[in-house]
A protein has these predicted regions:
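Solvent-exposed alpha-helices and their adjacent loops that cap or buttress functional pockets
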Residues: 16-20, 30-33, 147
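PLP-dependent enzyme catalytic core of the Aspartate aminotransferase-like
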Residues: 133-134, 145-173
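Cytosolic Rossmann-like ligand/nucleotide-binding regulatory domains
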Residues: 141-142
């Protein structure tokens, strides 16, 4: 199936890749889809092999039907509303470009999850609390989740954020 948008960092077109020689697609339903679980799509032979031999698949509990339906509904919204993907890509770019103006130590990723390395667990927790007091949500990520002295804050950029929201956060930081 042809890509809907090449503006998203996760799209093959964005990364200059071709999907002609790919045996399997793997992904999760967390983050962008807003549910949980994961998927693998591939040839019938590959899927049959995984169903018979994959221990994580064999020994895990099935996803509840309500989560399956929520995932389907989310995917329909994503597919139907191409503008959401385009706006997300624009918001990520705006965040990255504007953060540079403030000399923030942001990661190189063009994905919706952005991080700013702080190097101190106390500073990460302080920023998280101060941000929450201003109704801004950032997450402190500390050791042992990250290496010592690599503590950071995590920011989730969405298609529903406005440039005003993003700038307000960056001014705060």
């Amino acid at each position: 199936k042809k890509e809907k948008s090449s503006k998203l960092p996760s799209s093959f077109l964005y990364q200059g890749l071709s999907n002609n020689n790919i045996d399997a697609y793997m992904g999760t339903f967390g983050k962008a889809v807003g549910t949980f679980g994961s998927f693998i799509s591939g040839s019938k032979d590959l899927i049959d092999l995984l169903v018979q031999k994959s221990k994580p698949y064999i020994y895990s509990t099935s996803i509840p039907p309500s989560i399956v339906e929520a995932t389907r509904a989310s995917l329909k919204i994503i597919i139907k509303n191409k503008s959401l993907n385009d706006r997300l890509a624009e918001n990520i770019k705006f965040f990255k470009d504007t953060a540079k103006l403030y000399n923030l130590n942001i990661n190189k990723s063009m994905m919706p999850i952005q991080t700013i390395t702080l190097g101190s667990p106390e500073l990460a927790m302080k920023i998280q609390k101060l941000a929450l007091d201003k109704k801004l949500f950032v997450q402190a990520i500390r050791y042992p989740t990250v290496p010592k002295n690599k503590d950071l804050i995590r920011i989730n950029i969405t298609s529903k954020h406005t440039k005003k929201h993003i700038k307000e956060l960056l001014v705060f930081l």
